[in-house]
Amino acid sequence: MMESNEENREKKTIEDLPGVGEATAEKLRENGYDDIMAIAVASPKDLSDVTGIGEGAAAKIIAAARKFADIGNFETGEEILERRKSIQKLTTGSKNLDDLLGGGLETQAITEFFGEFGSGKTQIMHQLAVNCTLPKEKGGFDSDVMMIDTENTFRPERIIQMAKSKGADPDETLKRIHVARAYNSHHQILLAEKAQDTAKEYNIKLLIVDSLTAHFRSEYVGRGSLAERQQLLNKHMHDLLRFGTIYNAVIAVTNQVSARPDVFFGDPMAPIGGNIVGHTATFRIYLRKSKGGKRIARLIDSPYLPEGETVIQISEEGVSDGT
């Protein structure tokens, strides 16, 4: 049954959807909505904004796309379990951290790493980028990577170090990592929206955003702008999740923290983004510095895994369990 649905999706084009004429189809394609699945997981407002049609008409187009794609209906637990067999897991380079995450980072999910400056967030993103290009027998996907760099922290020299430690060709590894610098929050959102264009040309199985909240935090200051910030952040995260769902890709993001002034006992640090990030991220890892290059990684949120923590090592060779 699942195979026939997949074949049905491939045969249908967006022109087959009722209400999608030549002009509307062109506008949809220009904005990344060039297949049935992309439209099926969109919102009426998104389609209305890019095509100029009313939200009511957009809702009908989406409903038809969902029918073609066979999504949006109730499923049995058995059917969901069968569908989840398509999910793959990407190694972090540390068996300890992989075990904490139930085998690695899941595709079709957002995994958030948050912590203070120097806690290892960007190092882990570099390691994930290298690992994604590795063959499957080494825990990779043998696939390309996209990275949205918001703080100018991507370093090809670090990729070379990590690739060499994995026995991979550094030049070939660098060729498979596609980096875009985001200069503000709107540019960041646009890059995520356009990620599908790159995914059509390359086999992208990992999308990294480092850092998710830096631009939003600096541009939307004060309570007066909080609602707008959260609305944009919500849209951005759902764009990322949609990409992961459509391309069966891992979404890995980093996040900053701030101290809560109302906390007098325990750890006062909390991730930026509030409930929007908290509810949309599938897995949340809190990173803390320890001694001798070690980091403590704590899983604080997951749909099915228990809370727990482990120790990882970050060295010149990359992320590992250490000794």
Swiss-Prot record:
Ordered alphabetically, the record's keywords are:
ATP-binding, DNA damage, DNA recombination, DNA-binding, Nucleotide-binding
CDD domains, alphabetized: archRadA (cd19515)
| Highest taxon listed in the record's lineage | Archaea
Biased composition, class Basic and acidic residues, residue ranges = 1-15
The cross-references to SMART domains, in alphabetical order and at most eight, read: AAA, HhH1
Q: Which InterPro entries match?
A: AAA+_ATPase (IPR003593), DNA_recomb/repair_Rad51_C (IPR013632), DNA_recomb/repair_RadA (IPR011938), DNA_recomb/repair_RecA-like (IPR016467), DNA_repair_Rad51/TF_NusA_a-hlx (IPR010995), Hlx-hairpin-Hlx_DNA-bd_motif (IPR003583), P-loop_NTPase (IPR027417), RecA_ATP-bd (IPR020588)
User: PROSITE patterns annotated for this entry?
Assistant: RECA_2, RECA_3
Q: Carries keyword Nucleotide-binding?
A: yes
Q: Where does ATP bind?
A: 115-122
Residue numbers spanned by region Disordered: 1-21
Q: Does the keyword Magnesium apply?
A: no
List GO BP terms, alphabetically.
Answer: DNA recombination; DNA repair
Q: Which GO terms describe its molecular function?
A: ATP binding; ATP hydrolysis activity; ATP-dependent DNA damage sensor activity; damaged DNA binding
Its biological purpose is as follows:
Involved in DNA repair and in homologous recombination. Binds and assemble on single-stranded DNA to form a nucleoprotein filament. Hydrolyzes ATP in a ssDNA-dependent manner and promotes DNA strand exchange between homologous DNA molecules.
Q: Which family does it belong to?
A: Belongs to the eukaryotic RecA-like protein family.
PANTHER family recorded: MEIOTIC RECOMBINATION PROTEIN DMC1_LIM15 HOMOLOG (PTHR22942:SF30), RECA/RAD51/RADA DNA STRAND-PAIRING FAMILY MEMBER (PTHR22942)
Protein name, please?
DNA repair and recombination protein RadA
What species does this protein belong to? Thermoplasma acidophilum (strain ATCC 25905 / DSM 1728 / JCM 9062 / NBRC 15155 / AMRC-C165)
